Amino acid sequence: MAPMSIADLVAALPAEDTWGPATPSDNMLDGVPYAPFSKGDKLGRMADWTGDGKDRDRSGRQAYNRNYRDQQVYGAGTSSLFNIQVAEDESSFSVVDNTRTSTKRTFARGGGTVFRGRGQRGVGQRGGRAGFQRVGAGRGQGGDRYYDNRSARSNRGRRFGWKDYDKPQRTREPSVNVRPDWTMLEEVDFNRLSKLNLEAPEGEDLDSYGFLYYYDRSYDKAPVKNAERKLQALERAAYNVTTSQDPVIQELAEKNEATVFATSDILSMLMCAPRSVYSWDIVIVHQGDKIYFDKREGASIDLVTVNENAADAPVETADSSGKQESINTPSALALEATFINHNFALQTVVESEESKVTFNHPNPFYNAAEETEPLASKGYKYRRFDLSLQDDEEPLNMIVRTEVDAVMKNPVGGEDQHLIVKALNEFDSKAPGSGGALDWRSKLWSQRGAVVATEMKNNSIKLARWTTQAILAKADAMKLGFVSRANPRSATSHVILGVVGYKPREFAAQMNLNLGNGWGIVRTIVDRIRALDAEEEEDKVKKYVLIKDPNRPVIRLYSVPPNTFEEDDEAAEEQEEKAEDESEE
């Protein structure tokens, strides 16, 4: 080896004031950004295209810091010392978000338009009956985990999709058309009605009419599969006379037994008004110091609605040419449910003249000389309730005609129990408007609690009215039948799947039904009518109509001429007489 001089070594030294090998300034390795990493870093995804951007999360600053703060590429957990220094424009390059996200897109992410029914408070939603509202991007309780529903019958809402623009809208018609000579006196929304309260009176029995057959307890047993009993159409004479035409109430009014008079079906609608969705109307007649709560001939109050409170309730279709659609409209379902309730109460009793229970007086509406059909099992109990307040100068009493359908032996001994017999009906658990109901044939006895809870949600107003009627009549128990179509495509044949019994007070507690609120509504309406007529002549007849708005949670009070609806009743009577004459010929 040739010797090297000191001068050569000095000349080979670098000119900078550093020691060691030269440090390269380029942080690119074959055109790819490079950064040191730690073996202790948690492994993550190489790429995630399903995560939402920062601008989509509106859950607050805390969630933002948790999910997005200091999120870098793989190896970023070591220190900020190793952050990549961008040497050129990389605006199209996105760093990987390694936070845990769900790969399923849900309807709430896009803020979809959700149609909701009254009272169905979905998670993270507010809103009233039959309204459209925007659901924000994950603003609900817990965000997407409540909206990520894997069931098609979730009832928390749905996103409008293919051809939803062509689907019928829920714009309902009023139960009665407002005429030009009517004067609106007051409009009250349901929020104000829900705040009223009056201590619920117990009531006392004044008299009773009619008779009752004993309930057939074999219907309480679970039916054998594929051997359910068919619902029979029985011809029996049953009456539902309005208040002012009741001869017993007329007699009690002449004796000044009370100031206000009503029937349980009319009164229950008024007491449960905040739960109602469809339109209804009540006629109020004020004559002298007496107030009568009446109903029109063929009023909607007499019909039994189906899934009125469901989030996706049945709707009327403009073109009902299809049979399947026409039998599942609200009007068709109401007629079907009314038919079922009438016949179910008749079929579930044992018609025996030897064992029937007779009340103090015979049926006040039955005329054996004119009627050809046998009389149905029905008991009428006229009961008086004290609605007085401490500041009232005179007591305010109300007489209500209540009804019971059957009687049953007390299982523990004692007096017989009076029953209210009603029926819930299933039309098609898979059809639109079913409200996410379970299949009764397979779930009624294995998941009875879930079935009843769903019915409480979808038919809140109907069950509340029945429970109120049972409490007004001081009935000992309620029998709820579950009736389904033999074929979902036909509304003419039905089968009885089972019967469940409840005590009215306990059932009211399960439904969160407050009778004090109902009595408060009644007392408020009575006070309003009396205040309007305070300066009128005592003998003058004043008539009012209370109407529930078909599309808003509002009731309106109208002043109408005294002869309103009388011409309609006369025309209806003429048509009935003409039809009877034609049938006799």
From Swiss-Prot:
Keywords: Cytoplasm, Initiation factor, Protein biosynthesis, RNA-binding. It comes from the Eukaryota. GO terms for molecular function: mRNA cap binding; translation initiation factor activity. Its main location: cytoplasm. Residues 110-152, 560-585 are annotated as: Disordered. It is found in: Cytoplasm. InterPro entries: eIF3d (IPR007783). Residues 565-585 have a biased composition (Acidic residues). Residues 300-314 are annotated as: RNA gate. mRNA cap-binding component of the eukaryotic translation initiation factor 3 (eIF-3) complex, which is involved in protein synthesis of a specialized repertoire of mRNAs and, together with other initiation factors, stimulates binding of mRNA and methionyl-tRNAi to the 40S ribosome. The eIF-3 complex specifically targets and initiates translation of a subset of mRNAs involved in cell proliferation. In the eIF-3 complex, eif3d specifically recognizes and binds the 7-methylguanosine cap of a subset of mRNAs. This is Eukaryotic translation initiation factor 3 subunit D. It comes from Aspergillus fumigatus (strain ATCC MYA-4609 / CBS 101355 / FGSC A1100 / Af293).
